[in-house]
Each structure stands twice: as C-alpha cells, then as structure tokens.
C-alpha cells in the first residue's frame, strides 16, 4: 500500500487541550463559590432534621439544623441561601405566608442570626401555605385569581423584608407581581431589598421531588400560570416585563432543560441572570450515580458549568455547599 501524504496541519486545536494546566489557563467558564445559592427547607413543628426521600442529601430543617447548614454554606463561600417554609396549618388563602411569626419569617431570622453577612433570599409564593397547593388564591371557578393574589404577595414580601431578608424571590408567575411587590417594599421603607424575579418559570415535570420537600397539597397543575415548555419567545416577553417593573435579577427555572432560554435571557438582560437547577435535575443525577450509571462529581460539575456557560451569573443548586468545598480544594 502506497504511503499517504498529508499536507502539514497548521491549525491544531488539540494543542490547547494537551495538559491540565493549559486547559485551566484557557477555560472560558469558571465556577466560583460565590456564584452558588443554597436552597433550604424549614418545616414548622419538626423536632429533628428529616432527609427528603426523593432528594437524597437534601433535608427538611429545624432551627438548629438550618443554622448549622447556613454556617457550613458561609464557611464554604457560598453566595447566598434561599429559604422555603412549610407551615403546620394551611388555609385557602395561605395566610401563614404573611404571619410575622410564621415558619418562613422565623427561618429568615434564624439564618440572619447564624450568618449576618450572608445574603438571605426568601421565596415569595403561596403554594406552600395554601390548602390547595396553588401559588395564589382561587376564584369561584377554581382558577387562580391573579389580581386577588397580588396584594397577598405584597403583604408577604413586607413581612419577610421586616424579618431580615436581603433579597426576595417572587416565584408565583402572577402577572404584575414585581411592580406590586416593589411598590409595597418601597412604601414600607425597604428600598434596598433586592428582587430576584422568577421571570421564566416553566410548568415542568422536573419539579416533582420539590413537592415532597414542601409537603405540597397541590390539586391539579399550574399550567395556566407557569410557562409552556414548548415556548421560548414568551420568556423574553416575561423578562422584559419584569425588568420594566423593577426586577434586580431575572431567573430561568428549571436550568438544565432550558439552557437555550437561559442564553437568550442573558442576551437581552442588563441585570444579573440566575438559573435554578431544580429538584428533578438534582435527583436524576443523584439516583443515576447511586446506580453506578455515571460519575457523580464529574456530572455535577459538568451540569453546573453548562448552566454558567449558558449565561447564568448566579446558580441556585442543592449542591451549593458541596461544590463550593470542591472548588476551594482545587484552589488550595
């Protein structure tokens, strides 16, 4: 067989992949502990922390366990914590959401007490507090009444800001929610409270394990107010509206299944863009790793890097503390 001659190859991209040191030097995307936000669940009446069966490694917290987890997150350099609360009593309007001594307001105070310098983000939504599990109050026909819900979000937001939340995450996907909350906060003197708007929140099957985490009472689904997974352009409209209304952040949720939306959000936004790696995205990696199907650490890092590469400046993830520790080990 005759020798095959090839012309000299001048362009060799593999040169920049040859060693770990070179790969680190030319990496286009870098995770930092401060990029990460740790979501946490406080449960009223709990006497000891309880692991969530569908989210291995994630816990429902008591005051003591929450404060320890907040300390651990701060020590690792995590950027913030995000709090959700589950009350003992629920009613049709979710009145425990704006109880100044309710579980979520208390959890905010516990976190601030534990680490005064660590930003605390409080979720603003009624779904954990209503006996029907929807994100707002219901009209007589069973649909969520958008305009009747907005004043309740406003009351809830002021209570949480009073409790010490530096940031609020309005997640209910009600039209006009950012404007109403911003005005209520400003009128109450909380002009510096940051709004992290859940601008592009999809009616996703990946939220499944979260429902166990907050003991959801959901009846039906949320497709009439959360976004259709088939749509992307609609998200850009939602983002633009939230920015007009005073959002300081915008968010895409879920993250991994919506990287195209995240990239588009980054392209049109002049504020930080957050993305939430949700419970189902977390659990599918955890259970696949437990079954031996993949390398857990490698896939976690790849997943979070992909979210940052797509445009997220802030990533909400249940792996926040663990990943921050890994990142610190690499640097030391």
Swiss-Prot record:
Biological role stated in the UniProt entry: Catalyzes an early step in the biosynthesis of tetrapyrroles. Binds two molecules of 5-aminolevulinate per subunit, each at a distinct site, and catalyzes their condensation to form porphobilinogen.
- Where does this protein hold 5-aminolevulinate 1? 211, 222
Q: What CDD domains does UniProt report for this protein, alphabetically? A: ALAD_PBGS (cd00384)
- One GO location term (cellular component): cytosol
Q: Which reaction does it catalyse?
A: 2 5-aminolevulinate = porphobilinogen + 2 H2O + H(+)
Alphabetical list of InterPro entries matching this protein: ALAD, ALAD_AS, Aldolase_TIM
Q: What is its EC number?
A: 4.2.1.24
Native source organism of the sequence: Propionibacterium freudenreichii subsp. freudenreichii
Which Pfam families has this protein been placed in? ALAD
Record GO biological process: protoporphyrinogen IX biosynthetic process
Record's protein name: Delta-aminolevulinic acid dehydratase
